[in-house]
Amino acid sequence: MSEDLDRRHFLARLWTWGLGVMAGAAAWTSWDFLQPVAGQSGGPVATVSPDKIPTDSVLEVPAMRGYLTEIEGATEAIWWKCPHLGCKVPWCETSGQFECPCHGSVYNRKGEYRRGPAPRGMDRFEFTIIDGVVVPDTSKIIRGAPAGTPETINEPPKGPECLDPTAG
């Protein structure tokens, strides 16, 4: 009988030890996952001089992961990340608007919400002009206005959309 008792204690300790190892591994990987990726935290990014920014389209700037445009004399630095699920939102030259390929959200040239499942307009970056160059700070994000907020620019679509508006 004492042999069964020893075996029972051994198995109980083995299970406890095994569960402890699994819990430790889960905690370790979760902690590792929550740490910021080196070099991904954002910061100032030198781009182009203001006279190179289009007034009727957008300029894609991969280094800042976004776009620059000029609207009524004001520069806008727009993050290309969709606020719905984080997809990269490309500019559609034919329609003159941003169109998310993941779920069909559409934004005007200023990144303001037009339609789709996104909860708000596209986020923007704060920026300064240093030595004649636009320098967005990708660590300083300005949250887009909530869906349903009236657009501040009057630019209807120029033509056909790049994505099928009935898809999604």
Spans of features found by a protein language model:
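N-terminal pre-ligand scaffold of iron-sulfur
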Residues: 3, 9-95, 125-168
